[in-house]
């Protein structure tokens, strides 16, 4: 809560715990022409790809230890562009593929033996993500509309699922007797 200003105390609230990860988005690119390495099996209907290269910043960390089930990202920009990007991510992505080395094939959910393709999801619509408290007798849609008009930026978060692959497990360095882990990976969001 804030100190009172003209007798009014403001309450501040977050809907989710913040996880700070030792990661950096090193590069993000969008391509209409797909140039996947040999051995990559793309889903049928792919027309473009959004590639996000992530760097692991901590020498002690491993990908398996820092990557959550989903990587929550905030879409920042001009409102109409954010809207189009959110639509593309949450409605047009066919799969999230991982590339551990620059010239190696992209690994899809099929090649990893996962039961279904991974797709980004919208954040901010669940009851446990509410910013405003409403009477339980009120319809959830009323809360969502109120929050959308009062806090539209709250809905600019997207969870990008990260496939768990064996190549991301490894030792932090060669000194501990293991194989050195790759310090960068690329997530390829293939779009229809």
Across the structure, where does each feature detected by a protein language model lie?
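Intrinsically disordered, low-complexity, polar/charged repeat-rich segments
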Residues: 1-192
